[in-house]
């Protein structure tokens, strides 16, 4: 099973994903492929697989990627090989944007997909972005806030839409969703 967490940058996807992995057995994350520069705290091969633009584009040409998109001038995508291998052993939890979610729902026929969209009020989103450790510039904050309306307009793609106001509560709800969906 593949559990997709979506929401705009700052919605809490990564924090929730890490907490779910800590609390639940047999659930893992897989790294995304990206061309963005490595940041402090990134673990190559675990959080991301860092590629040059040329390497990423070669993987696209060779049909090695299920979905990809460009955010803030960098490619992000999901490796077919990694997802196929890991999903045989584990439930995979992955944070993916709305475009990637749509593509995976169209493409993956042999893996059960559960999609969860995390909502956060726009004002709260700005506050979270401004308080991040890797605080984005004002220009990046504006770009991410502009993306908010687009992402919110696509919530019909999702099986579940949760308002993420309280981490503990949201994680508990997602744990229950995963348990219930695993039974089906």
Regions found by a protein language model. Name each.
Residues 156-170:
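Phosphate-binding beta-loop-alpha motif at adenosine-nucleotide cofactor sites
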Residues 36-40, 87, 96-98, 102-156, ...:
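A glycine- and Lys/Arg-enriched "phosphate-lid" helix/loop adjacent to the NTP-binding pocket
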Residues 28, 34-92, 98-100:
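ATP-dependent small-molecule kinase phosphotransfer cores
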